[in-house]
Amino acid sequence: MAQTRSRNPWPCESLAIAGCTMIVASCAGSSGSTGGSMRASSVTVSEPMSADAAANQLTAAEAAAGWQLLFDGKTLNGWHGLGFKDMPPGLWVVEDGAIKHVRKGQGPVQPDGQPLTGVDLISDRSFADFELAWEWKVAEAGNSGLKYNVSEELSTAMSPPHAAKGWEYQMLDDEKAEDNKLATHRAGALYDMFAPNEKKRINPAGEWNRSAIVFRGNHGEHWLNGEKVVEFDLGTARFDSAFAKSKYRTYPAWFATRRAGHIVLQDHDDSVWFRSIKIWEMR
């Protein structure tokens, strides 16, 4: 089993984001995970600052450490509509340096609220063993998510065919969204499986939040505004029990052990914005 990580998984250099300043303490050293050492940033959360600094950019230190931008701040290059070669028009746009989902109004939905006519935005590339950081905000009562370890083949074979099948980092207006009744459905959760812990602090609808996912081997973590709020390990009794009670229980058996896949921005037919999407592959 991978060891518990003890550092914030944010890229190098000072970042004024999501109501907190990330200040670099070190940009090299052991990760605390099994399987050898790796370069990594170590940061400290300081006083609140503007969320608008250095969006969609890599610092020199980040670039040197191997971080990559998955969104250039101007185009949807590197992304396509799930199940399509490109992106059907009118659903996803770039607006003011952010990827925005354009709300179309309530249509037919699945029991979990997933629109039957929506189209998720999926990365062209797939990833294994990574740290992913991004900023996001939702409109009032908004609901969305970022999915990872997604199989496009499995996704298009199941209904709805343009909605991703993968682990979901929940993004939600915890105060007013309809799907706020269960702790495992609130912001920061591994959706329908693990609720965020007591360290969680969330900015309200319309304000930027900063999130990160760490996924290596069997080990996964969700971070929200500088705090680790979810931690899990594939194949453990705790994980298998949560999986068996979740909406994923009807998926193929191999889904529960999947360790690689695409990154997906969810179309939940609400207005949601993503920016500063950065990934570091652990090699």
Feature locations, PLM:
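Bacterial N-terminal signal peptides that target proteins for export
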Residues: A2-A16
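Short stretches within intrinsically disordered, low-complexity N-terminal or propeptide regions
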Residues: T4, A18-C20, S30, S42
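Bacterial N-terminal signal peptides
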Residues: S14-S26
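Carbohydrate-interacting regions of secretory-pathway proteins
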Residues: C27-R283
